[in-house]
Structures are given as C-alpha cells and as structure tokens.
C-alpha cells in the first residue's frame, strides 16, 4: 500500500526581518529585493538558545495533536536539514527526545533545499514495504545561523522555519505518494552553492572564521539557471510518467527559492499561476522547510480535496533535485 499524508504542520518563528530592516544593514532597498526575489520579509528565530531542533520539535508536537497519535506510536522520525543543532547527534534524535517518541528510530537527511523530498521519498518506502505504520517526516532550517548579513546576495534570500507530515498507509489504492524521481549532480553543483567551513576539510579555525567560510556561498546566476531547468524537467517527467496534463494538476508545490524561479518553473510547465502555491514573499527561502510549510498552509486553508493531484518539486545544493506526485486522500 502506498504511503499517504495523514497530517501536516508548520512552525514559523515570531521574529520578522523585513526588507526595510535589511536596508539599514546592507547596501540594498526594498524595491530592489522585491523585484529580484519577490521577498518582502522573512522569519527569524532570534533566541540564541533555540535552534533547528526547537522548530522541528514544535512541528512534531503539532503533528501528534492533529493526528491524535501518542508519541510512543511513532516508529520512525526523519528530519531533513542542513543546519543541525550540532554535527552530532542528529537533529532527529533531539526531536525524538523533545516529544518523547521512545519507540521511534531517528535520523537526518542533508540534501539542502531538496531535503524534504528526499526524506519523503525515503520514508514512503518503509510504509510501502509494510514494515512501519506511522512515520514522521520534518524539514526545517535555521538559515539565519549560517547567513553572512554583510553579503546582500544571500542575506536577502533566506529565513527560518520548519514543516512536516505524518505518513501512514493509504486507505485505498491509487492515493498517497504515487511516484518520485530524485537526482544529484555533484560534478556541476559542488562549486556553486556551498558552505566551506565547519566540516572535516575546513574545521573551525581563526582563519576560517576570518574568511567567512562558515556562511553560505551562492553563485546566484548559475543556481537560478540550473534550478529552473531541473525543477521544470523533473516536473514534466513526473507528469509524463503518470499521464498528467497541466489541467490535471491541482497544485504545483515548488521549493520557495525566489519568486522568479517559481514563476519561471510554472511557465515552463504550462501551469497557471493560480495553481502554484507561493509564500516566499512572507517567509523567504527556509530551505528544507519550504515544501512542508506550503503543504501545511494548503491543508489548513482547505485547498486540498480528496483526489487532488499535487506535484512537488525542489532543487538544492549538491546539486540535488527531485519531484514527487501525491494524490491527496
């Protein structure tokens, strides 16, 4: 039996970093930011004692309440993140502790902005195989912890947030996660979107800190071109493999990198913007959090009906990208 989404949830911190705030910090302005990214503000987790696990823990608690599950009923927790609280233990283990899911095993997946789709695809296999009944999948990042707020090319893009889902066996055939295609390209991707510092190649030293190696670096032009092409191509592949036309697609749920990428992807797919969810203007790019946050907003807003066809697409560092076809039950 296919895996189906039985609950959704999201967490966005209360702190807001607006374009006007960035005007006071950087050589930029609101009009320039909005025209190039579509972003007006982003959420920031300002409490230095709280990190990615806190946001993911909030999502996990909501998911349990919404689905009416006890924490002990969870069998697996997968967290997609590129900003773990620490190198180890995994953020998923920290979330397990936060909610008291003592019977679940837990691990992280790091595929940057594609992380949630990688995790969703991975988790669905355990349901489909019949070895697990209740699996929690969360995507979240505290991007403000790795942003250089003197670099306007990246500081304007990213925000903090998390979202997640619970997966269970679909109630009937033909619903749930019906197809997925995942890709990676380390050859062309490794130099254009990365954080050099903090790993075994460049462990923390005075030099790595002075050189700003512990902040995200992005070649915006290269990433833009690759993101649009890759997301549109994998979406087209998903649609072709499953006999879907643009009219059949109820919602395109794209990674919220920036509005230009979202619009260009939808245009290449021939999907009307009225069927494309976009919240990047309010939250910025929350990396692994974008797609589950979108799903939660659609769900809470009553926009997902029985039989709705969702095409989820993402692109991230690596390069990594992928698409998932979900028929809502």
UniProtKB/Swiss-Prot annotation:
EC number annotated for this UniProt entry: 2.3.1.180
GO biological process: fatty acid biosynthetic process; secondary metabolite biosynthetic process
Keywords recorded for this protein, A-Z: Acyltransferase, Cytoplasm, Fatty acid biosynthesis, Fatty acid metabolism, Lipid biosynthesis, Lipid metabolism, Multifunctional enzyme, Transferase
Top-rank taxon: Bacteria
UniProt GO cellular component terms: cytoplasm
Pfam families the record matches: ACP_syn_III (PF08545), ACP_syn_III_C (PF08541)
Quaternary structure note: Homodimer.
Protein name: Beta-ketoacyl-[acyl-carrier-protein] synthase III
Organism of origin: Chlorobium luteolum (strain DSM 273 / BCRC 81028 / 2530)
Gene: fabH
